[in-house]
């Protein structure tokens, strides 16, 4: 029994939130729902909680979701959902993991402090915020705002249609899902001459 091996540990449960708690403009999966975690709509979450409570007096909650807008309202809705779960099952919470998907240093967008303060205000009436740990997973929000990808040209070929410029870096390094439509970039060139059509290709 795996839970016996971890009975001395701080066990966390991944919650599968009902997508209906979010605004449709914020979440892509309103109709299909999320794939990870235990759902409170079909008693799976209740069963998971009961199993954990046989071995531990406290429990952690994981509440990740994917947002297309990175809106602060997404995390407010998620925190309110967590509060309802905590109240419903009378949970003694050791930590709460709100996942990632935050903006990172983008001018005019929600700051890290604003996210955290909004989340804190929801949890403060229900948990001891001095003892209950809050985890966030900013990931790309950290690295995306402080890292530049620097590439150089390694090959140039003239074809019938265009000049093909190959670099030693690739789009996959900064946009592995190939979703982004435009990029902030700067050029360092030896000449200011503007050639006819050029296509910049990543290294593959």
Please place each PLM-identified region on the residue numbering.
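A short helix->loop->beta-strand "cap" motif at the edges of active sites that frequently abuts
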Residues: 9, 130-132
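Short glycine/threonine-rich loop-to-helix capping motif typified by GTGT followed
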Residues: 71-77, 105-116, 144-155
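Active-site-proximal beta-alpha core segment in soluble small-molecule metabolic enzymes
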Residues: 1-95
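Conserved, mostly hydrophobic/aromatic
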Residues: 13, 61, 98, 137, ...
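Alpha-helix-loop-beta-strand connector modules within alpha/beta enzyme cores
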Residues: 82-86, 116-127
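Charged (often Lys/Glu-rich) extended helix/loop segments that serve as interaction or gating elements
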Residues: 118, 133-204
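Glycine-rich beta-strand-to-loop/alpha-helix junction loops that act as flexible
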Residues: 64-66, 96-106, 136-141
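Secondary-structure transition/capping motifs at alpha-helix termini
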Residues: 87-92, 126-130, 158-161
């Amino acid at each position: 029994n795996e839970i016996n091996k971890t009975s001395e540990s701080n066990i966390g449960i991944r919650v599968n939130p009902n997508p209906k708690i979010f605004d449709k403009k914020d979440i892509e999966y309103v109709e299909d729902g999320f794939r990870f975690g235990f759902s409170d709509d079909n008693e799976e979450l209740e069963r998971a909680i009961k199993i954990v409570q046989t071995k531990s007096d406290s429990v952690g909650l994981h509440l990740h979701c994917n947002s297309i807008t990175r809106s602060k309202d997404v995390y407010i809705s998620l925190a309110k959902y967590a509060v309802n779960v905590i109240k419903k099952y009378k949970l003694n919470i050791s930590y709460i993991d709100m996942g990632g998907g935050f903006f990172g240093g983008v001018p005019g967008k929600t700051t890290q402090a604003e996210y955290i303060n909004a989340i804190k205000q929801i949890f403060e009436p229900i948990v001891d915020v001095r003892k209950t740990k809050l985890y966030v997973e900013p990931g790309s929000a950290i690295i995306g705002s402080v890292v530049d990808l620097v590439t150089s040209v390694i090959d140039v070929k003239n074809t019938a249609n265009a000049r093909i410029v190959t670099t030693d870096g690739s789009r996959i390094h900064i946009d592995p899902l190939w979703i982004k439509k435009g990029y902030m970039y700067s050029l360092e060139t030896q000449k200011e001459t503007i050639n006819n059509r050029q296509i910049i290709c990543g290294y593959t």
